Regions:
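Mg2+/Mn2+-dependent nuclease catalytic core
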Residues: 119-176
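Metal-dependent nuclease catalytic cores that hydrolyze phosphodiester bonds in DNA/RNA
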Residues: 1-142
């Protein structure tokens, strides 16, 4: 089996690709059913959106430019109109305090000695495509970070997850 490695593939293009992803494959396993496999993806939560923001800020230089901070109560007319205008321009509105919290988390990650070493030399958001030999099914995966290989050393592939707590016990519960 040989995988095709694609760097710099836009996120929307990756998600539109028809190959089977891990998250869709899980929907085929018991106790799931075909209807769940064919159902639309679940609605994204605020926590998922925050994790995506931290992910982008930590791994993708310049990602902040895709976000526009908007103050105020977004249900009121002026901020609501500003949010709509930002989205119409293809950008993401963000509350300033949410952006500040995400930036702090991304900075902590980048200055942590182990995390910084893992994210030192490589590429973010690397897409992999291959055909499963046993089934002939085309598959896909997206790695948060793919380190550049070093001769004679094991290749480590870090996966960034955000959680309320960094304690091993709490994170273990959240990550299952």
């Amino acid at each position: 089996m040989s995988a095709r490695v694609v760097r710099d593939m836009p996120e929307a293009e990756y998600h539109a690709h028809p190959a089977l992803s891990q998250s869709r494959a899980k929907r085929l396993l018991p106790p799931s059913c075909p209807a769940k496999f064919h159902a639309p993806d679940p609605e994204r939560t605020d926590a998922m959106e925050f994790g995506k923001l931290v992910h982008k800020l930590a791994l993708e230089p310049g990602a902040e430019s895709g976000y526009v901070p908007i103050d105020g109560n977004w249900s009121h007319k002026e901020p609501r109109d500003a949010v709509a205008a930002v989205r119409a321009a293809g950008l993401e509105p963000i509350k300033p305090e949410v952006m500040a919290r995400a930036k702090r988390m991304a900075e902590k990650l980048r200055t942590h000695p182990v995390a910084a070493a893992l994210l030192d030399d490589g590429n973010p958001e690397v897409s992999l495509f291959w055909t499963d030999e046993a089934t002939g099914v085309e598959c896909r995966a997206r790695l948060d970070w793919l380190r550049n290989p070093v001769e004679g050393r094991r290749l480590l592939i870090p996966d960034l997850k955000s959680a309320r707590s960094g304690s091993p016990t709490e994170f273990g519960k959240a990550a299952k």
